[in-house]
């Protein structure tokens, strides 16, 4: 019993120190969505400030601002983790989507329209394999008949 008393005396200051140091730790109870939604706009504001350095006509070229976008993504991840939320989550994704709408609404993916090649190219591409298949089949049949006659 006497050995446990000194341990208990040291335990209380350690617990108090832990509580003091862990004042900014994420809550154990889970995600604090209100705090997350209050903190994420800082990331958006910082990203908007960085995007001002890029000319507007270059906003659709990811290579022009990839460093800024990476910083924005890291910021949203850190802010959601600080408040005890996982990342990505639906609220963070909707915030990120809003930032995308604000900055990249004029960027559309140009879908390439595929067309068949001209008939001069298409017909040989179809006919040659068919003729080769028929020729090889005929050759195999002819050789097998010839081999049967030799025996």
Swiss-Prot record:
Positions in the Cytoplasmic compartment: 142-151
Role this protein plays: Accessory protein that interacts with and modulates the function of G-protein coupled receptors including calcitonin gene-related peptide type 1 receptor (CALCRL), calcitonin receptor (CALCR) and G-protein coupled estrogen receptor 1 (GPER1). Required for the transport of CALCRL and GPER1 receptors to the plasma membrane. Plays a role in cardioprotection by reducing cardiac hypertrophy and perivascular fibrosis in a GPER1-dependent manner. Together with CALCRL, form a receptor complex for adrenomedullin/ADM and intermedin/ADM2. Together with CALCR, act as a receptor complex for amylin/IAPP.
Coiled coil: none
Organism: Sus scrofa
Disulfide bonds: 43-75, 60-107
Span of the signal peptide: 1-30
GO cellular component, one term: cell surface
Residues the record marks as site: Required for CALCRL interaction: 116, 144
A Pfam family it matches: RAMP
Residues bearing attached sugar chains per UniProt: 61, 106
Oligomeric and partner information: Heterodimer of CALCRL and RAMP3; interaction induces allosteric modulation of CALCRL function and ligand specificity for adrenomedullin/ADM and intermedin/ADM2. Heterodimer of CALCR and RAMP3; interaction form the receptor complex AMYR3 for amylin/IAPP. Interacts with GPER1.
One GO term of the biological process aspect: protein localization to plasma membrane
Protein's membrane topology: Single-pass type I membrane protein
Keyword Signal: yes
Record localization: Cell membrane; Membrane
Name of this protein: Receptor activity-modifying protein 3
Membrane topology, Extracellular segments: 31-116
Keyword tags: Cell membrane, Disulfide bond, Glycoprotein, Membrane, Receptor, Signal, Transmembrane, Transmembrane helix, Transport
One annotated GO molecular function: coreceptor activity
TM region positions: 117-141
């Amino acid at each position: 019993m006497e050995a446990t008393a000194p341990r208990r005396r040291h335990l209380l200051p350690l617990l108090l120190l832990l509580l003091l140091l862990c004042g900014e730790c994420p809550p154990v109870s889970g995600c604090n969505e209100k705090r997350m939604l209050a903190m994420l706009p800082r990331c958006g504001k910082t990203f908007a400030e960085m995007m001002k350095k890029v000319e507007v006509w270059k906003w659709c070229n990811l290579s022009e601002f990839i460093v800024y976008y990476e910083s924005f993504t890291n910021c949203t991840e850190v802010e959601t983790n600080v408040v005890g939320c996982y990342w990505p989550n639906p609220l963070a994704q909707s915030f990120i989507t809003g930032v995308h709408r604000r900055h990249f609404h004029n960027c559309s993916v140009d879908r390439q329209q595929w067309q068949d090649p001209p008939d001069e190219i298409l017909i040989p591409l179809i006919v040659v394999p068919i003729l080769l298949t028929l020729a090889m089949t005929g050759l195999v049949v002819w050789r097998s008949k010839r081999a049967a006659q030799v025996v």
